[in-house]
Structures are given as C-alpha cells and as structure tokens.
Amino acid sequence: MNKRWLKLAAVPVALSLVAAACGSDDDSSSDGDTETTEGGGDAGGDAEAGGDADFGGATITITGPERDDPSIIAINDTLGAWAESVNLNVEYTGDADWEANINTQVEGGNPPDISFFPQPGKLADFARAGNVVALPDDVNATVDEYWADGYQLYGNVDDVQYGIPAKTDLKSLVWYQPAAFEEAGYEVPTTFDEFTALVDQMAADGGPKPLCVGIESGQATGWTFTDWVEDMVLRQAGADVYDQWVSNEIPFDDPQIVEAMQTVVDLWTEENVFASGGSIAATAFQDNGQPLVDGQCYMHRQANFYAGLFPEGTTFADPEDPTAVDVFYFPDVNGDKPVLTAGIFAAAFNDDPATMAVMDYIATAEYAETRQRNQTEAVGGGLSGYLSAAQGQDPSVYQALEQSFLEILNASQIARFDGSDLMPADVGAGTFWTEGTSLVNGDITAEEAAATIQASWPS
C-alpha cells in the first residue's frame, strides 16, 4: 500500500460531517438498464430485524441505481438469505435510469416498497411531497444503535427520519498503478499544484494520457463532472464557501464556483484525457478502469466504489505485482485535507410490517458485514467496491486498503457530503448534470453553465 496513504489514514483528527441539507451521490453501475438477481448467499448471523415474525411469503421490491453485477448479487444474496428466516421474498432491481424511473413509478402510483436514494436531496423532495413514509420508533432505535448522528442527518427531513444509510462512499481518491509511475519516474503528488504539474509533465512526455475520464451514465450523465467540481470548491474556496454554495447562500454564478468549474475543464483537455468512447461525454463512467490497467492513462479520480468496476482479476495495493492498482488522496490546495463523501439511503414507500422489517435489517451492522462478505465473493476476492460506516462491524471483513478508507472517513477534519446530492433534485440531479455536460462538450462557457444552473434553483 502507498506509504503516503497510510500516513494520511493514521492522522487522528475529529470527524466533522456538516449538514447543509440532506444528500448523497453514487451511480456505481455496469452496462445494461435494469438487472435483478435472486438472493441466496451468506445470511450472516442471527437476524435482529423481524425477530420470530412470519410474513407469509410476501414479496418486498427494492430499486436503486447500483446495477453492477457484484452489487446486485450482494444486495440480493444478503437480503434474500436473511428474508428466508422471516418467510419473506426480497427482490432488488438495479436501474440505469433510476432517477427518471422512480419519478414515473411514483407518479403512476406503483412505486417499489423500498428504494435506494443516491441523492438525499431527492429523498427530501419525496418526503415533503408525502411519497415516502417516516421511520417508526423501533426502526429509528436500530438506526440510532448503528449509525452516528452525522450519517443519520442526511436521511432526516425537517426533523423527521425517513432514510437509512445503506452505503458510504469516499470520493476524494485517485486510482493509479504504482509500477507505471515508478517506471516513468513520477511521484505521487501531495498538493494540487504538484498534481497539475504532474498532469502537464505526463502530457509533455507523450506516453499514456494523464487521466482517464468519462461522464456518460444514462439519465445521470454528468454526475462525475459534479464530483470534480465539488472537490475543487472544497479545495480552492474552502468548507465554509462549500456549505453556503450547497444551500444557495452563495449562488452558482459566484466567481469562486465558476473558478472551480473552469479548473476542471482546463484539466480535461484532449492532450490530458483518454476517453475510450471517443469523447468524455460519450465515455461511460464505468469504462475507465480497463484503460488504466492497460496503460492507456496514468490516473483516474473516482470514489472507493470504483474498485468493483476494475477488470476481473485486478490486484490492489500489492507491491509485488507490477500491474497492481492503488490509490492516493486527491491532493488539496491549502493543506487542510478535505474529503468529499457520499452514500445511499434506503427509504420506504409504505409502512407495512414486512417493509419495515426489511428497513430495520438494512440499518444493522449485520447487513453491512454480510453485504461486504457477499460482494467481496462476487468480485472474486478483491476489493469489493462497497463500504459502510455502520458502527459495530467486524473490521476484518474489509481488506487493508478498504479499512484505510474507513479510517479516512472517520478521521477527516473537513468532510463534506456530495454537494449536488444535497441540492434540490432539479438542480443537483438536473441542470448541474446537463449544463456540466454541455460545458464539457465545449458548447457553453463555465459562466454560461453557472448562470443557467443558478436560474433553475427553485424559488
């Protein structure tokens, strides 16, 4: 494992997750529109949720944006095996166009029993519209037992808990091959200035491109651009500005936000980027692992979950393997080591006892541990791509590199949740994506994109 990373992971500083609203962002996915598998894997220990209940073979449907095969298998196996103990059937379907389809399902009066929300801003919209139900006291007690207040906060709307944390992501990471760096004489950058200088040097050397980038993701195309912008706002303008931007106290067209957007597109030039789809906007976000492993680019900035999207057989953090992939912290500007986080939250569309039994189980450390075991198995024993900050987990279910991710999450002095996921859905999962994509395509300027996004903010 990278020594710099270990040193960073060990820094004992206090957690400071700040709530600007209620939000998340993850679209870890593979090819295809919707995918469902039947559960039947590791059920973990004795299930707490449901107790000795018998739900008579009822079926609980769950939808969400996670549609890569390992995630689908792990979710269904984890929930399916537990559900057998209470005579339930649970079916999870991963949807490439979850953002659009969940709206259609709700408007048509046929929502799933539960859905996984990658944008708690959207969850807040649904809660205020009366589409999802508040958690009952017994489920709230389970959430309190296993989740710190900082994580619960993003599923809380107007002092009522609707969402349960189901997955945690650390986004401020850069994937790379240490052996490729060593062969070319490059060193891991520790400041953002060093990072940009390294990108310039790589481009000038004329070998593999510095970066692999792709932002295509179906209806969610553009979300990877928003992640880069959020990381840059945190680094260039600081946490206070970030919080005010997310809550619209500082508008999108403020020069500090425009600067962050411009910084990203200045890095994403033809000289700097390998885009396997021919252009950044046409390259699926999940298609950047293969070219990095194949030596077509040196770096890919993406969250911890991307471990599950590298080609089968990829090794991680192994100094004996010249093809091994590792990560380094996306460098900061001012030495304050901010991190961008995200997550997925489960919310229910009805309060049936069977639905709430599933929600209760999702809130437990047992669910997190069991999903991690199942997902590790589904990827063939490598990094799973899954992470959970649930308290009370056995850390041994995570590999060393994954444990360092959790250490970073729980020790970051400045940690901020994904800004676009905290914003109203029309902005964070709407114009920020679409205008960002137009900016990346060169159709508009950063100033024009920012002005249009700001104009879309609900009054």
How would you describe each model-predicted region?
Residues 23-124, 129, 141-143, 334, ...:
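Conserved N-terminal structural module of periplasmic/extracytoplasmic solute-binding proteins
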Residues 49-54, 120-172, 224, 324-326:
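Hinge/lid segment of periplasmic solute-binding proteins
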Residues 80, 184, 313-381:
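Extracytoplasmic/periplasmic substrate-recognition and gating elements
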Residues 104-105, 112-113, 143-179, 209, ...:
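A structural signal for short loop-to-beta-strand junctions that line the ligand-binding cleft
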Residues 136-149, 215, 219, 223, ...:
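Short, solvent-exposed loop/beta-turn-alpha elements that line the ligand-binding surface or hinge
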Residues 162-166, 196-250:
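Extracytoplasmic/periplasmic solute-binding protein
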Residues 199, 246-278:
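Glycine-centered hinge/linker elements that transmit conformational signals in sensory
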Residues 381, 399-457:
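C-terminal capping/gating helix-and-loop segments adjacent to ligand/active sites or protein-protein/ligand interfaces
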